[in-house]
Amino acid sequence: MLILQCVRPRSAPYAHMSGSLPVTLAESLFFNPINADFCLPHPTHRVDFPFEQYAKVLGHAPPADWKPPSDECRRRHHHRPPPPPPPPHGPPPPGYPPPPPPPPDDFEDDWFWDEEGGPPPPPPPPPPPPHGGPHGHYDPSCDPMKLSNLDEGLFDPLTTALKQNKPKIKNVLLVTLESTRKDMFPFKKGTHAYDTILSSYGSPDAAETLDKKLRNLTTTASFLTGESTRFEEDAAFNGTGHLGAWASEFAGAKGGINVQGAVTGSAYTLKSLITSLCGMEPLPVDFTDEVRAHMYQPCLPQILSMLNKAEQAKGKKEDGFLSWPWDTAHVQSVTDQFDSQYILDDQMGFRTFVTDDTLDDPASGHYPPKEPRNNYFGYPETETLPYMRDLFANAKRDNRRLFVSHMTSTTHHPFAVPAAWPGKETYMAKRRFAPEADEFESYLNTIKWQDGYLDSLLSMLHAEGALNETLVVMVGDHGLAFKASDDCKSNFENGHIANFGIPMLFLHPDLPRVQLDIADAATPTSIIPTVLDLLLQTDSLSDASSEVAKGLLPRYQGHSMIREQRWSVPVLNYSSSSASSSPYHDPYDFHHPHDAPNAIIDASFPTTNASANTHPFHFSIINPGGSLLAISQSHSPYRLVFPLCSTLPLRFTDLSSSPNEQTVAPLIAWSVDAMVKAVRARHGDDAAAWADLARRLGEWWFWEQRRRWGYHLPARSTDRGVVDGYAVGQIRKKHWWET
């Protein structure tokens, strides 16, 4: 029986079919989820936002005219009538079993007009779930978690730089750094990671030799962030690093905004892309089932398409690049066939793709690849540089603007650097029977390789004359825990803090260096608001495009990272009739692709200042998505790992006393009452109240995200049946006989 438990298949439906009966019965009797509702397509009871508890923990009553508790918002969330019936040939409802997904070329993007000038038919709505609206929908003015800083001023250095340097943003490059922990960007002496490496030698005398190797581990990252590595010879931080000519463009105090406290929205790469590229929080379900649901916000490529349509509607061209059309591309050196990424990329609005298939295509402009494949997903990122160079060169030649999403991959397991790379080092002391140390060392080498690659990437932009007119956004998709450094391994169903801290920075040679404090934590959902705000503040959009951007900016769940981190909350608008008074009109509903871009301009909402104790909560989905949720809050040291459809326990930590969650053992409990009691005994009443509120917020957020996405299938892939659970979390094969 033990052997069968080890070798039996894990994918649906075999995971259920091949379980040994005694073990399966024992699991059902003794290992049940703390809240089994999270395993179901719908809750068994109504789940409301804990308004009173939220106000009590914050220590103040909300404004009397705070909009989310109003009857208007309750009607919108719970009694919104369905849209007109669909045509009989329409696609199946979002969240319900669809036919096999079509190839990207057949995908019809319902955010925009079709080629004939009329809108494509709307998808049919699923039956209204018991707890809320009929399908995907988000209204920021009715979101009790919505905090806005758009009424705040820009950071002082930024205001001065905009007047003096007049930065120009013609292009945007968003680089997603695979599995890149914040403590590796840059790597610093004296950190827990450094101490882990040094301790492997058993003697502090090894520090001098070790420092010579480690001080150049993340030269580029140190220069870009403006954070010292704390080594005596900190060449990059002192401006004398061996970087490309591009570094001279960032003279003095220039560089951009470095968000030191960034937290991932998901420890699963493709869900993390949804937060950064679409400004949406992902679905708390296994794998990328967002492709079966309905995106409730336009992603960045779709926003840029809206700007193109606004320019077309205006007709009159403005001088310079402001009226040039935007092109979009997604570039990676690995496959896009894993877990439906090829569908997700297309649904996001990308129309140009570079993947490993491009590199393998004899008809490609830079075939054959110069390097062999270095992992089971594809090639090293350097193979994409010629293709990205072509994108920027062609955009410049054709008077077009460019948005490129680029994802690295070498830092992903199995942590293999190109065989011909000469920079490989030995960092950890060799110990017999210690494969976990070998794996961490391999990861460190991929971090060093990636750092050099970023230098090459910026050198390419500089050589093409695009660096001074390109906003470069760098963000990690998630962190990664290692047994050697964190006493736990991987990000799979693992709520350790090492899996969540990520780099996030906005770079431009004419922007000043702004360091956002670690306490001002943010998630990648703030990337789109920040990019739009920067385009507006630098006068990098035409009048027509600016109107669209201004209308879109307040809609998103994230915040602008170029403004003071003080908050306002939505309030009722007594001065004008609500646009939502018509039961079929909603200014925040993006499900009508035939709406003209100027139809969104009047959708802003009034706000009032929030209490000084009000700070954003952050919800981070843990790989694979439906089992655990990590909950944290800006300016709070507390973290709660909350089980969803999982037999795992609750886990509470206080980062003020245990920044790496190892100095003090986490509190573990198997019931909410036991957790609150344990937190109160160790950390006091305030911490206990926070933990209980975080648990209530997590429960509400779980079902609210399903309502927003219009998704009503089980959270775990093994519970979705043969059709819905097939091939999720796997690479799609080209032939049926491939296994």
Question: Where are the regions that the model predicts?
Answer:
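Active-site-proximal alpha/beta segments of enzymes that process anionic O-linked groups
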Residues: 4-80, 95, 103-119, 128-174, ...
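Short, flexible loop segments at boundaries between secondary-structure elements
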Residues: 432-441
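Membrane-interface soluble catalytic domains
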Residues: 2-16, 77-78, 82-84, 91, ...
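Histidine-centered active-site/metal-ligand motif
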Residues: 410-413, 478, 485, 739
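Histidine-centered active-site microenvironments of extracellular/periplasmic hydrolases
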Residues: 188-192, 462-512, 574-575
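Substrate-binding rim/cap in mid-to-C-terminal beta-strand-loop elements of soluble/periplasmic
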Residues: 257-283, 431, 489-546
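Beta-strand elements within well-structured catalytic alpha/beta cores of enzymes
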Residues: 102, 165-187, 304, 401-409, ...
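A structural signal for well-ordered alpha-helical segments within the folded catalytic domains
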Residues: 170, 215, 219, 294-302, ...
